[in-house]
Amino acid sequence: MIWVAVIITMLLFILVAKPTGVYLEKAFQGSKTLDKVFGPFEKLIFKITGVKEYNQTWKQYALSLVLLNGFMIVVVYFIFRLQGVLPLNPAHIEGMEPTLAFNTAISFMADTNLQHYSGENGLSYLSQLIGITFLMFAAPATTLALVMAFIRGLAGKELGNFFVDFTRALTRVFLPIAFIAALVFVALGVPQTLDGAVTAQTIDGAKQSILRGPVASFVSIKELGNNGGGFFGANSTHPFENPGQMSNILQMMLMMLLPTALPFTYGRMVGNKKQGRILFVSLFMVFLLGFITITTSELNGNPALNGMGIEHVQGSAEGKEVRFGTVFSSLYATVTTAAETGAVNTMHDTLTPIGGLVPLVNMMLNTVYGGVGAGFVNIIMYAIIAVFISGLMVGRTPEFLGKKIEGKEMKLIAVTILFHPLLILGFSALALSTNLGTDAISHSGFHGLTQVVYEYTSSAANNGSGFEGLGDNTPFWNITTGLVMFLGRYFSLITMLAVAASLKEKTVVPETVGTFRTDNSLFGGIFIGTIVIVGALTFFPMLVLGPIAEFLTLK
């Protein structure tokens, strides 16, 4: 029965992807999508803010994005620092320590949601609502806006206006869908209140304080925007965030909704729907491979316990919630790292070595399917690399969407693809070379190495999940992961927008019999191979020293 539920969940992922992709294309291309509802609201926002609907250059678009995001980071930083004297603080929580406030503000603006604090004890209701939830809408709206400009550039059209795209992302995508999802979560038992904690009497007569809050509205945008941060420290393992299997499936659907839709949006916007379909199918195959690998490993259990003759029919149950089980915990771990969300319904630090390898690889590749917007930019980056390599092998000038791929584009892509592993491996080496980093490690040996690399991988990929055995709430970890999150977020977005702008200016080369097609299964295979090979060449030595070595040791 459990496998039937898994298959149905997978089918739901597939069934909602195309309609959502069609809706996104219409919403951002000026087609009518509930204009009577959203149009007046958007015009009012433009009038109040003074936004004018004109086309920007790629530099203007990128500058608008960075300045708006930077302003939001500063505002939210001071909210966190001053929450102790601000209203909506029934628990009388004090202001955040400076480096933690720095880390948290960047974390949520970068759509990472890395949390070095426990949500219910670290933030007031004002900080949760005005600080965290606000950024949970703003962060994915930023990248969804940018990816639309990116696709327009690839299609040879004007990039558009960042502020217009940002507003449409909020009004036509995130606000309505998150509102409906929040109502469903309330119906499923997720609390939504501004009241403080309640005191309950336990069976043995003791008193217990039960924390609550505006959780349903928080969880809906947490998953839809691929944010992932928890209202509670336990994240989606907490019964108030994720009461049962229905809420669990809904959370996974929200996580996958926009990342899986964007390939179809792309296909429609560039005028070749097959392009989108082949990307969707190729990435879904990689996703399935990851799910099968982690599930098999977790169902086989811990090799160390197997050697003791201990039977565990449910597989490796450590760190998992009984109400979800091993299979759905494995699926959730695959989804949350494939969609770069970072929400967890099981503790990733307790996964088996190979089970923990899958989330790590998903984040290192950062492209299966990746988070809202940013992930799709990485997908196209790998697609262009695949075209470039194929062109070199047959002695032709590489072409993508009828545009020649030349030195300028490849230099930008080369720098971008190297920057991701440089952040991860460089900062991991720094942490491992100083007591400021190693003092936080709770496990020695191979697993300790994986803890460190996982933290920086999660930060660079804007995922936010963690091996929570790492004691990371220190100035060193707060500052270094904050820098990694900021650089990992904005560097690739800006460089790839420059690539799209460069391709926009090029004339379309007529298609001939020798043109390498990018809308068939051959390209799909080369595309997958490029992702795997580039990822393996970059990160394989670290994976051997970490999870693979741990697995072989336990065996």
Curated annotation (Swiss-Prot):
It is a multi-pass membrane protein. It comes from the Bacteria. The keyword Amino-acid biosynthesis does not apply. GO terms for molecular function: P-type potassium transmembrane transporter activity; potassium ion binding. One of its GO terms (cellular component) is plasma membrane. The keyword Transmembrane helix applies. It holds the Pfam family KdpA. The chain crosses the membrane at residues 2-22, 60-80, 130-150, 173-193, 246-266, 278-298, 374-394, 412-432, 483-503, 525-545. Keywords: Cell membrane, Ion transport, Membrane, Potassium, Potassium transport, Transmembrane, Transmembrane helix, Transport. It is found in: Cell membrane. The system is composed of three essential subunits: KdpA, KdpB and KdpC. Belongs to the KdpA family. This is Potassium-transporting ATPase potassium-binding subunit. It comes from Bacillus cereus (strain B4264). The gene is kdpA.
